[in-house]
UniProtKB/Swiss-Prot annotation:
Region: Alpha C-terminal domain (alpha-CTD), residue numbers: 250-330
Region annotation Alpha N-terminal domain (alpha-NTD): where it falls in the sequence: 1-231
The family this protein is said to belong to: Belongs to the RNA polymerase alpha chain family.
Cellular component aspect of the GO annotation: cytoplasm; DNA-directed RNA polymerase complex
GO molecular function: DNA binding; DNA-directed RNA polymerase activity; protein dimerization activity
Function field: DNA-dependent RNA polymerase catalyzes the transcription of DNA into RNA using the four ribonucleoside triphosphates as substrates.
Keyword Aminoacyl-tRNA synthetase listed: no
Record-given protein name: DNA-directed RNA polymerase subunit alpha
Record's keyword terms, sorted: DNA-directed RNA polymerase, Nucleotidyltransferase, Transcription, Transferase
Self-association and partners: Homodimer. The RNAP catalytic core consists of 2 alpha, 1 beta, 1 beta' and 1 omega subunit. When a sigma factor is associated with the core the holoenzyme is formed, which can initiate transcription.
E.C. no: 2.7.7.6
Amino acid sequence: MQTNLLKPKTINVEQLGANRAKVTLEPFERGYGHTLGNALRRVLLSSMVGHAATEVTIAGVLHEYSSIDGVQEDVVNILLNLKGVVFKLHNRDEVTLSLRKDGEGPITAADIQTPHDVEIVNPDHVIMNLSHGGKIDMQIKVENGRGYVPGNVRRYGDESPKSIGRIVLDASFSPVKRVSYTVESARVEQRTDLDKLVLEIETNGAVTAEDAVRASAKILVEQLAVFAQLEGNELGAIINDPAPRSSQQFDPILLRPVDELELTVRSANCLKAENIYYIGDLIQRTENELLKTPNLGRKSLNEIKEVLASRGLTLGMRLESWPPAGLDKR
């Protein structure tokens, strides 16, 4: 009897657009399409290294709820637009860039002054618009990182995060914008119970979809290799000496506000009334607990379950040492 597991022999990459691609792998043993597809999707969304603006200083601006004379957008909208700029740093981990311009007209990412080893992938992206007599002078700190990191949980050593005029941004480092996967039937000779995995990936242009899949697969291999090397004593040490609360690492998805789930206003307000501000708070609630929430009915519950399922999450999950130290519970 054949006991060796099948490995994919056919890999096909189909370009669906400038930053979108469909990657097809087959054949897999039955069930392995979902096993590997979900794992790759989670890694692609949460663990890819990328670059993002993390801090901004604007001349004459003390906080983000300000407006600037001669600039059509307020500071909040400027920061939102700035988050849409895609950076690539070569041979460095962080950089501080300058943006200085005056005169009427739009300001795009191309107006940011960059050294030779910093690349802006979408130079036509509009950051703000100046009116007659308007001018802007700002400093932008760009760092590398993984996933999504809220500004209020990042650490700054001895430097105070409350420095006047220094605006700390929530940073979405991941170059992967969307990932979905489907599992179809595959056939090898007389066997018809095999899986074909189809991954559809969209990136921000900083990496190609193929490179993203390679990088995510490498991360999985490196993580799983540890299990193949486990020894009894080492495993016991891990069990008897759990990581302290301060060093516990959480999936960056769990640190995102529930507002990013794009729920209806009714559902979102019900969650906030129950002090559920982050996705990590939400997934620890059970269906029965949520149904006891005033004004949250079965329709809203189904909406929440569907949105979580699209991100590979469910209700009733348990997280050790939640919430992480420094998380703003508002």
